[in-house]
């Protein structure tokens, strides 16, 4: 009898053991693929004649690739992301009943005294006749980087409010310190600045809905996708890749910060250059960094952790 009970116990134990899934080994090749990306980025940066800082942030697992990412660079027009964010935040506050906040629906009547250099859309409006909304001004600011539209929005939301919002998000090195095309302010050292790492943090908070409501987050990203001018990140990317970004250019400076929507693996990226001897080379370098990063995330988005390309799931299944 005892022998029979022992045999039954042994059989049951063996059956249970056989049903347990063996633990998978963790030393996969994904870290090697990441190291290859780091090497390629290092090579691009090393052969660039100016100074390059960059941050790449995986929006799926938070992994980051950093090079000179905590150094402060001029943002040029990339700072317009922060202006746009403040406009959206104030619109939300106004909906909640706050007084004195800018709304997306507020009307602006074009005044020619607001014109500055690189204001192609605003310059074509009829003075004291054409009326547009703050949302329209934001579209001019983002889609074609209209500087007059940007300056009007800075006046309406308040430069100090933009900076207060950035500080509230923990971004202490990202600062709006002057309006667009204010050469006197720039000569005083009042440059608009940020670090690549802080720009990716800002984009991550926007993407994850930590800076705006869900509704406004969707509207914000949709508007940032409408860029039609000088996107350096998109230089080498396939035409069908969605990108929400804002580039910037000054003499000797090229920057671009945005979210690249690689399938199943979106990432935030900010590349900033300064002391550029060859500005076209800087633009190409930003495009090369973005392409190498995209290739990595596009591959990770369609493979298992062991590197097998997985078949696509048919729609509806």
Predicted regions and their residues:
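Structured C-terminal helix/loop/strand segments within mature extracytoplasmic catalytic/sensor domains
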Residues: 20-44, 156-158, 201-231, 247-317
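A short, well-structured edge-of-sheet supersecondary motif
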Residues: 36-69
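Active-site SXXK
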Residues: 62, 74-108, 269
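Conserved catalytic neighborhood of penicillin-recognizing serine enzymes
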Residues: 113-151, 159, 192
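Mid-domain, small-residue-enriched loop/turn segments at the edges of structured enzyme/sensor domains
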Residues: 51, 130, 151-208
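Sec-dependent signal peptide recognition
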Residues: 2-9
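Acidic helix-start/capping segments at beta-turn-to-alpha-helix junctions
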Residues: 59-60, 101-122, 157-158, 223, ...
